Amino acid sequence: MTASTLPRSDVEFTTLDGLTLRGWLFPASQRGPALIMSPGFNMPKDAILPDIAKWFQEHGITCLLYDPRGIGASDGEPRNDIDARQQAEHLHDAVTWFKENPLVNEKQIALWGLCFGGNVTLAAAAFDKRVAAAIAVAPLIDSTGNPERRQPILELAMHDRASRLDGEEPMYLPYVNEDGSIPNGLQLAAEMMPALERLGIPVENRISVQTYYKSLSWNILNVVQYISPTPAMMVTPELDVSCPTEDQLNCFEHMKEPKELDILKGKGHLDWVFGDVESILNRQLDFLKRHMAF
């Protein structure tokens, strides 16, 4: 992708629960379709998505990219406390705010999410029919983790709740350990955090214990059937280990028409951003054009 000369501005909006979420607006050159983008698990808006937002901006789509609650520039305490249901609700508030922008055709607002953001995007699209289309890229489907870690996580969560009632600070765990494992037993690439540091992406390597308590009660498979009749596209790397390919395909099977699947041959969770990303994004643009008529 080439460097963009189009503008980017700082924006903020208020959620129903009184928080201010802050992000970036990538305005297209004229009024038309719009895209709200959601980053990965415990990730700020800076991670990977700005270049993709610029690409869509250059192709006539106004994009909104913001830090989720408790991350980066956005409000929310405790910090790094991730709640899928709450993030989906905040996407509803983002739509409410975004549709008032003079550059945005309120009938052509789509959602786009990466990894955990893909999960949240699917959930928000299931319940908010103001959304015209949804794209989930390498979505994290099962966030409950290794069953052997369930009881230790719950015990930590109960200890944390009791301690906080006594005035203690929230309990945190490393987001990613040196070997690439995360607290619930799932495995990420060991080089992920060092790579983000080299790229200058400000990811805090910590996450609240309560994040994993909340994840144990969240199952996207219970809601994806309600996305229809909103058109949805799933973009699945063939060799995804971080968000297993088979989980993504199983989720796609649970979804109803209209739906489209784009399998990225030979690609892992994030390495699709290197190489021929243009063709991948062009297929997503074609999906949006066909279903949002622009």
UniProtKB/Swiss-Prot annotation:
EC number(s) reported in the record: 2.3.-.-
Entry keywords, A to Z: Transferase
Lineage top rank: taxon: Eukaryota
Catalytic-site annotation from UniProt: 115, 240, 269
A GO molecular-function annotation: transferase activity
Coiled coil: none
Subunit note: Homodimer.
Name of this protein: Polyketide transferase grgF
Native species: Penicillium sp
Chain's gene name: grgF
